[in-house]
């Protein structure tokens, strides 16, 4: 089931105040390390300009501030997620380094070849038009720049895949029913994670969108994956 941009916007608006808390529970805090891995990968390019697409509450955008002399822009379709992110940025006194903008990943309002690094953390599967969104990322990425994507994936190992399916069907639904004001949002996120192409299938889509030298780094036995692609 694919949701429209308006539905995605409304869904994330409804869970904006609980998103960080539940993300910590659902990933057992693992997302923090994986986002640190994104920064480590990005640092290799010595980037000056960084775009974090689907920035949400700005976790990754804020982490990028660890890279000296970098200017970071985060965009997201959800105004309320951005409000949470802006508060975090203000609390860390990073307003001069990290700027958040309401924007659409499939229609980026930036010049071509503008960014040394583009990141997308747990957002690419929510693109209404995946290929269009990836081609827009390719357009605004500078030559030799890197696209770094962190996304949920389904483990290839049968045992881990079985555990993953039980975990998503039982644990995530239970936790969201207890703590979330909109449990249906997490049901959608769980289903979209299972239906999204991962591994080699997603690599083919990245290559078709113009990227090259795609590398895959599975996390937590393949329950999440970092994809690194070059322009």
Identify the function of each model-found stretch:
Residues 131-143:
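A short glycine-rich, Lys/Arg-flanked "PGG" loop and its adjoining helix->strand segment in the class I
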Residues 1-20, 168, 179:
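N-terminal, positively charged/glycine-rich alpha-helical extensions of SAM-dependent methyltransferases
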Residues 209-231:
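Core SAM-dependent methyltransferase catalytic element
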């Amino acid at each position: 089931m694919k949701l429209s941009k308006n539905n995605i916007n409304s869904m994330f608006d409804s869970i904006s105040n609980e998103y960080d808390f539940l993300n910590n529970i659902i990933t057992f805090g693992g997302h923090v390390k994986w986002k640190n891995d994104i920064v480590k990968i990005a640092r290799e390019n010595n980037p000056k300009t960084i775009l974090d697409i689907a920035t949400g509450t700005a976790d990754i955008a804020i982490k990028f501030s660890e890279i000296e002399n970098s200017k970071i822009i985060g965009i997201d379709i959800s105004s309320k997620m951005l409000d949470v992110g802006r508060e975090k940025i203000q609390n860390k006194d990073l307003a001069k380094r990290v700027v958040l903008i309401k924007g659409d990943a499939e229609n980026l309002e930036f010049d071509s070849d503008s960014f040394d690094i583009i990141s997308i953390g747990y957002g690419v599967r929510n693109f209404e038009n995946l290929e269009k969104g990836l081609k827009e990322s390719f357009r605004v990425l500078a030559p030799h720049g890197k696209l770094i994507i962190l996304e949920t994936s389904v483990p290839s190992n049968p045992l881990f895949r079985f555990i993953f399916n039980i975990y998503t069907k039982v644990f995530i639904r239970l936790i969201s029913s207890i703590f979330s004001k909109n449990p249906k949002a997490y049901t959608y996120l769980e289903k979209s994670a299972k239906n999204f192409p991962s591994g080699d299938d997603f690599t083919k889509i990245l290559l078709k969108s113009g990227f090259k030298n795609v590398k895959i780094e599975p996390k937590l036995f393949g329950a999440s994956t970092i994809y690194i692609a070059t322009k």
